[in-house]
């Protein structure tokens, strides 16, 4: 996480003896250089952090407010278009999480510039109730909803979204 969320006591968590605090640009560059895999920074919620991740060499970012754990934080879909514009023609991928519970939510994120979405809490209930089959049903339903909205708005595939399919009010 680019912005590790502290515990509810206002202090940073300690994981394996390391305090989880804010991540500097140099920290991020080090993480990217140490990894043999494409590095993804999660918890990006500002243009400044997106540009920091780009400068550090991250392959992708996840625009996220940790599902509401950051009180008063901007919603990921509100800041997503600003981040997309700031990154310009960068080949860094942009993913979004937080509240991606339906295919309609995924549609909005893709229309606003995301390359993909992450689904977490949306699959927990089906997983607990029906196991793997519940997750498969949920994901199939989300895909159907996404395809439905794409059909209604003339979007031929997820690579060809036209951001005018949504009315976005800039901040």
Residue spans of the language-model regions?
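Alpha/beta enzyme core
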Residues: 1-96, 103-125, 158-161, 169
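Generic anion/oxyanion-binding catalytic loop in active/binding sites
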Residues: 69, 98, 147-150
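C-terminal extensions of enzymes
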Residues: 123, 131-171
């Amino acid at each position: 996480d680019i912005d590790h969320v502290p515990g509810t006591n206002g202090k940073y968590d300690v994981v394996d003896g390391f305090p989880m605090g804010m991540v500097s640009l140099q920290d991020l560059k080090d993480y990217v250089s140490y990894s043999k895999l494409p590095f993804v920074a999660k918890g990006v919620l500002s243009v400044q952090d997106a540009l920091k991740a780009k400068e550090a060499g991250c392959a992708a970012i996840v625009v996220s407010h940790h599902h509401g754990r950051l009180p008063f934080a901007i919603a990921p879909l509100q800041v997503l278009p600003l981040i997309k514009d700031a990154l310009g023609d960068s080949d860094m991928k942009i993913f979004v999480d937080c509240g991606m519970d339906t295919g309609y939510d995924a549609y909005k994120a893709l229309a606003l510039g995301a390359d993909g979405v992450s689904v977490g809490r949306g699959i927990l209930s089906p997983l607990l109730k029906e196991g793997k089959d519940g997750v498969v049903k949920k994901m199939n339903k989300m895909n159907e909803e996404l395809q439905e909205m794409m059909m209604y708005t003339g979007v031929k595939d997820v690579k060809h979204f036209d951001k005018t399919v949504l009315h976005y009010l800039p901040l």
